[in-house]
């Protein structure tokens, strides 16, 4: 968690679940697309230690945002976002979305953007045809969080609307 995180939007990129070779589970990523805007967060990198963040985000490339981030910081600092390189994407396999990962993402969107933000997250994210592994009883996502009953219900209510398959 970053204490100085704040809401922001990323212009010209869309969000999607991506499969990569050698991983059992998919990753949430972004790809360039003209005319799109997605919600997210910005935060200072603790201790400006980009190497540590790059190590944590090992399957992602750090990309300079070059003014694509809409935010309220003046003067605007240099910013970057992370994307899984397209040359590592695979289109088939037994990959799954970890429900514990999705839960954490939705919990964050709810806290930062409210119910409407959660709706926008589901609506602006692609790849819901990937099966979802219900690992809530024994989370496999390393940064899993405990959700309230209301947060869990919010996640669960969106999945049928997207024809998502929970295993």
Language model regions located:
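A glycine-rich, hydrophobic/aromatic-adjacent loop/helix-cap motif
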Residues: 1-167
């Amino acid at each position: 968690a970053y204490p100085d995180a704040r809401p922001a939007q990323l212009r010209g990129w869309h969000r999607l679940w991506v499969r990569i070779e050698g991983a059992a589970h998919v990753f949430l990523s972004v790809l360039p697309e003209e005319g799109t805007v997605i919600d997210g967060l910005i935060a200072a990198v603790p201790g400006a230690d980009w190497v540590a963040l790059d190590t944590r985000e090992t399957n992602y490339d750090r990309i300079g945002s070059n003014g694509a981030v809409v935010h309220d910081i003046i003067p605007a600092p240099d910013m970057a976002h992370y994307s899984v390189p397209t040359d590592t994407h695979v289109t088939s396999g037994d990959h799954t979305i970890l429900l514990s990962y999705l839960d954490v993402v939705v919990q964050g969107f709810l806290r930062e953007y409210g119910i409407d933000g959660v709706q926008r997250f589901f609506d602006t994210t692609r790849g819901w045809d990937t099966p979802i592994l219900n690992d809530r009883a024994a989370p496999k996502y390393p940064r899993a969080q405990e959700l309230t009953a209301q947060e869990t219900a919010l996640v669960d209510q969106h999945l049928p609307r997207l024809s998502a398959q929970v295993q």
